[in-house]
């Protein structure tokens, strides 16, 4: 035991010194190497050599595996799950699997419903319009699935013309949605029964 740390230099003996020329106290990953924080993990393998409460960071994102919800994927999410990929940087993690109930998506599903939009993260009705009223393309009907995108975003639109049901002058005619003069003929000159 040339370094006097209590671990023998014979590589085939019991508890052989992995660092025979340097006195050390590591016992977890290898015997007899330096362990600055005294947690048992050698400084060679310890991702946090100065912190005895943390030892391993499998994905290299500076979070210990014990606090990292995605130990094999580097990430910077902090709000719903810690240490998972967060493409848009809003703090909510990107989805890793599809929600079990995509119609009623919520934060407990563990991921950002809109991972490419930093202003939106929650989409309760799963229609693609975020529930944050101050974010981009906010859902005016956050609990009702909808495809409207002309007068307001994310509200029911039975004829899929872009105008929400409550504001569509022709709710069953997809080529007309507005009638400014109220004469029963649509304002879209290319639609069915246009106003002359």
List PLM regions with ranges.
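Extracellular calcium-associated, cysteine-rich motifs in secreted modular proteins
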Residues: 1-196
């Amino acid at each position: 035991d040339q370094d006097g740390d209590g671990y023998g230099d014979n590589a085939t003996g019991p508890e052989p010194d992995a660092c025979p020329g340097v006195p050390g106290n590591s016992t977890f990953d290898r015997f007899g190497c330096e362990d600055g924080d005294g947690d048992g993990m050698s400084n060679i393998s310890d991702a946090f050599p100065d912190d005895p409460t943390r030892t391993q960071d499998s994905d290299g994102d500076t979070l210990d595996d014990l606090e990292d919800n995605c130990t094999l994927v580097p990430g910077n999410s902090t709000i719903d799950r810690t240490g998972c990929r967060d493409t848009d940087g809003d703090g909510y993690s990107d989805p890793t699997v599809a929600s079990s109930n995509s119609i009623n998506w919520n934060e407990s599903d563990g991921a950002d419903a809109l991972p490419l939009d930093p202003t939106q993260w929650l989409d309760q009705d799963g229609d693609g319009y975020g529930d944050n009223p101050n974010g981009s393309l906010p859902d005016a009907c956050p609990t009702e699935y909808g495809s409207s995108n002309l007068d307001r975003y994310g509200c029911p639109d039975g004829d899929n013309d872009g105008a929400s049901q409550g504001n569509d002058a022709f709710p069953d005619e997809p080529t007309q949605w507005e009638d400014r003069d109220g004469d029963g003929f649509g304002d879209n000159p290319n639609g069915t029964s246009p106003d002359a």
